[in-house]
């Protein structure tokens, strides 16, 4: 199974790139973790946010291979504990499809992305900056993988 993180934004601070890549490299070859960055629409005082969201959503959906299981990261989503995420990761593996996780930009995900999603995951009830979410998702998924594989990374 391949994990694919599709995220809005292309110029992240160095600490975001370093943090994400640290967890990305820890995944085994049979569970590659790929990052696809979608350019953020230009935002300004008179920006048409609905149009920007629509365009970002179209680009995100176009980046997802047909047949992938799509998980949106969104506040109304399911809030999983770490063991529940490990169970979910195992289910995704057993399903046999690759998984695409969607992270929106400053205004969140486009409605089209939410509608296309097979599942919705609420990482936290807190409002988090979208660059930080990349690192949190990578770490959370690596921790879930470590639980499923009896790796000593996770401690109860």
Swiss-Prot record:
Name the InterPro entries on file. Alpha/beta_knot_MTases, RlmH-like, tRNA_m1G_MTases_N
A Pfam family it matches: SPOUT_MTase
Gene3D superfamilies to which the protein is assigned, alphabetical: 3.40.1280.10
- What coarse category fits the chief subcellular location reported for this protein? cytoplasm
Catalytically driven reaction(s): pseudouridine(1915) in 23S rRNA + S-adenosyl-L-methionine = N(3)-methylpseudouridine(1915) in 23S rRNA + S-adenosyl-L-homocysteine + H(+)
Q: Where in the cell is it found?
A: Cytoplasm
A single GO cellular-component term from the record reads: cytoplasm
The EC number of this protein is 2.1.1.177
Q: Which residues cross the membrane?
A: none
Annotated disulfide bonds = none
Q: Keywords in UniProt for this one?
A: Cytoplasm, Methyltransferase, rRNA processing, S-adenosyl-L-methionine, Transferase
What Gene Ontology terms describe what this protein does at the molecular function level? rRNA (pseudouridine-N3-)-methyltransferase activity
Q: Which domain of life is it from?
A: Bacteria
**Residues at which S-adenosyl-L-methionine binds:** 73, 104, 123-128
Q: How does it assemble?
A: Homodimer.
Q: What does this protein do?
A: Specifically methylates the pseudouridine at position 1915 (m3Psi1915) in 23S rRNA.
The UniProt family comment states: Belongs to the RNA methyltransferase RlmH family.
Q: What is this protein called?
A: Ribosomal RNA large subunit methyltransferase H
Give the originating organism.
Shewanella loihica (strain ATCC BAA-1088 / PV-4)
Query: Gene name, please?
Result: rlmH
């Amino acid at each position: 199974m391949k994990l694919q993180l599709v995220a809005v934004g292309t110029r992240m601070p160095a600490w975001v790139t370093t943090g994400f890549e640290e967890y990305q490299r820890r995944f085994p070859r049979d569970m590659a973790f790929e990052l696809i960055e979608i350019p953020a629409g230009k935002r300004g005082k008179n920006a048409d946010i609905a149009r920007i969201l629509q365009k970002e959503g179209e680009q995100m959906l176009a980046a997802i291979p047909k047949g992938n299981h799509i998980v949106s990261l969104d506040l109304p989503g399911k809030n999983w504990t770490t063991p529940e995420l490990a169970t979910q990761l195992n289910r995704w593996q057993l399903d046999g499809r690759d998984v695409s996780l969607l992270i929106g930009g400053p205004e969140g995900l486009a409605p089209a992305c939410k509608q296309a999603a097979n599942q919705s995951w609420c990482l936290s009830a807190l409002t988090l900056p979208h660059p930080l979410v990349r690192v949190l998702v990578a770490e959370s998924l690596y921790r879930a993988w470590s639980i499923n594989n009896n790796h000593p990374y996770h401690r109860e």
